[in-house]
């Protein structure tokens, strides 16, 4: 069995201009409290706003907490980043070669201009073989990969390197064609969640969706076709935090008592790419 020993999120409701590895430092210190950092086997960081092109944000984080025995690498999976990090950490621990792996996500939105609807946030979870009250039962994800032009950063990669003109035109910032694309993706994500749960014979007591805007949240909730009291809604008006989104919502639901004991919880993520992800936990 694989467990989440502790999960802590941080939602800033602003752009902090903090490096990603600094932004997630507080949640990480909270989830490893009382633990020797040398016992951390790995750090997986989901982010598209890492401190440097290289080294990785996870490497920077590992240095700050002195996790000298840990492997470290970053992943990019947009809005489903935290669940993707969980999936990898789960696999490492399930292999029984590793006992403690940090799955973190941190987004610091220096790559946005002010009109974009994003706020800084971070989340950390300690994935472990040590029995805890949150058991990871199931994780799945899928990617379409055909929607590049709808939400991406146009400049800065091999296809379009940095240019003076491009920077003036803000092509190094996140580009979103239309917020309505996420409203439609929310419907598709709800269908994916229902089909995946049905196929695997999983019954859910409580759903925690990622958030982008109120409209996309409502579309997800309505398309899921379950009692609205079974859906965590306290983040529905919050700005998105990309890969940290679902993890922050999960952490808040744990802290505010929305998740009841002896319940089966579905953490749902969706976004650009297009990516969809689902994690199921038993909370005792």
PLM regions with names:
Residues 21, 25-28, 49-51, 63, ...:
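Claisen-condensing/thiolase-fold acyl-transfer catalytic domains that form or cleave C-C bonds
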Residues 1-44, 65, 69, 132-239, ...:
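Conserved "HGTGT" condensation-loop signature of ketosynthase/thiolase-family condensing enzymes
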Residues 41, 70-71, 122, 263:
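Surface-exposed loop/turn positions
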Residues 41-59:
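Membrane helical hairpin/interfacial module
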Residues 73-75:
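A short, Trp-centered hydrophobic/proline-enriched beta-strand micro-motif
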